[in-house]
Amino acid sequence: MFEYVKDLGLKPARPYTRRKMTDLIVLHHFAADASPEEVHRYHIGRGHKGIDYNVVVLLDGSAARGRGMAYAGGHVLNSGASRGMNARSVGIACQGNFDVRPMPAAQKGMLFRVIRDC
């Protein structure tokens, strides 16, 4: 499973925490055409362990490993009603900004595949 997700070799600034359970999937978009590597560097620059998402779905319809499926993400603000969601959710981010243009069909197809395999 997830053999189609390419490993970009993104190294965390600090070790990731293993996720013990999964009962949520949270979808995001970058709000930019930034690469996963750029987002990884940006998140580290903000004091995060590394890229906050478990998987990234690219505009071309491919998928790339973020933190990986075994680890807790950092993709949900950890306060109020969302407290603790990172420890129990898979964070899937899509490259692009869908406020300015629609998601390409190939990307949408891969997003559905990743969700199905979660």
Label the model's feature ranges.
Residues 1-118:
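Active-site-adjacent loop/helix surface patches within enzyme catalytic domains
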